[in-house]
Amino acid sequence: EPVFLDFKKDMSQLTAKSDIPVLYKQNVANDLFQLIYVFDMGNNNDKALGTAFDYLEYLGTSDMTPEELKSEFYRLACTFYVSPGNERTYVVLSGLNENMPAAMQLFEKLLADAQVNKEAYENLVEDILKARTDAKLNQGKNFSRLMNYAMYGPQSPATNVLTEAELISMNPQELVDRIHNQNNYKHRILYYGPSSSKDLLATIDQYHQVPAVLKDIPAGNEY
């Protein structure tokens, strides 16, 4: 039967640079790790945030193409993804623990140095608009929208999205700026992996690119 973590009892509470709280649990079963940055902000705080991190998947840096980045993550046996919800955003890096420092350095480089790709943005907008058109023909999604309306009224998390006009007119640099700025906001880190707490904090302090003082989370819409 599954065992659920009690964060206060089962995880050590550490502190990294910039007073970032770190919840630590050592993995004694294998050589894999998962490192998660948790931000208590999401689409309710900035309706463009989800689109920005959808865009990240297609971006390179000033000296690496998207294909080169993917190839390097593959070589390191590590993966990443960013999952922005309405109220919380999870930035997740995972893979082979011995390569975590190199993977973290690469991932932090991407977050800090992602470069605009106009063609990729145009394709992303096309995909988003097509998905919205398809959703209108999906009875289940229409019912979900109806339930949202009944619960929240005309303004809800489901309606708090970039409009077609906003997507088409947006300069993709605005999305890239959001990616660059994400680590500047207050957040906490969760780690599950083989590293000792001392080694983990040393890795975070060396590679996590954050200012000395983190910014407060911007106010969000309440529904």
Regions found by a protein language model. Name each.
Residues 3-17, 168-170:
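Extended non-catalytic domains of envelope/secretory-pathway proteins
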Residues 1-4, 17-48, 186, 212-223:
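His/Glu-based metal-binding/catalytic segments typifying zinc-dependent metallopeptidases
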Residues 13, 23, 79-81:
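Short, surface-exposed charged micro-motifs
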